[in-house]
Amino acid sequence: MMNMQIRMFVRQWTLAISMIAGISSYFILKWLPLGNDAHSLMLQGVHIVQPILIFLMLFLTFCRVHPSQLRLSRWQIWNLLLQTGMFLLLCLLLIIFPETSFRVEIEGALLCFICPTATAAVVVTSKLGGRAGTTTTYTLLINLCVAILVPLLVPAVHPQQGMTFTHAFCVVLSKVFPLLLCPIIAAELLRRISPSITSRLASYKDLPFHLWAIALALALAVTTRSLINSHVSVGVAAGVAVASLLACIIQFGIGRMAGSKYGDPISAAQSCGQKNTVFAIWMGYTFLTPVTSLAGGFYSIWHNVYNSWQLAQMKKKNTDAGAK
């Protein structure tokens, strides 16, 4: 009984536990007398492990999805136009006004808009009564768009010193494209080669969730390091928080509106609003101003708070209906 209660508590508060673990681990390691070499080695380790975790999360998710489950809908077009359109607009702003005093906030917002759908979105969509097939299809579509657009525009938005656009494009492409598309290809190949192994992997339903918790903790440790070392002001941090909140409200709101037109508001809202924030954090500290990775951390709070509220409302509604 006690073990069950502990498991329920950990699962219910995984977000908070991961965030606290990630933030506190940075300060603990900083205070330990390990030396700069050890700290640098651990940071390099995180940079290697983080993409692997993201890859595995996506791979295990796509192992559970059979091509016959995929469903196209017109709302997916509107969601794609919103995400890619806002990303293009914000990139254009930074290219035209590179010295703007709101650069960090704009970078944070563009991260939140282009960030692909979370692997957990299918689960939440199903619990809220939406269609898992259309959500999964949108996850594939937005991953394809991100894999193409990010390498094309990020080098122009945040040029690397001493690196040509072509070189920067190839560097970003080599990191983003395999990370988002290889899990899809690998899952489909495994399904064709060994359906039994694919089914076995798909049976571990909680594994992507646990990998996400580890990846989130590592991402927040790196984000905390970036925040401390950048000496960013409270005002800038608050600006990034507001930018991520607005991006969250806009995407959930417009996603729901688009889905309502085609009888699928829950799936459309979750597909557009629930994000793979670990990817956003990784992209922020890897390709943009490191402090912009805060946007992913804040967004993780906003979308999880909103979904927790939705699930609580649904549970209350079902309880009331059962009482009648």
Predicted feature descriptions by range:
Residues 1-324:
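Alpha-helical transmembrane segments of multi-pass small-molecule/ion transporters
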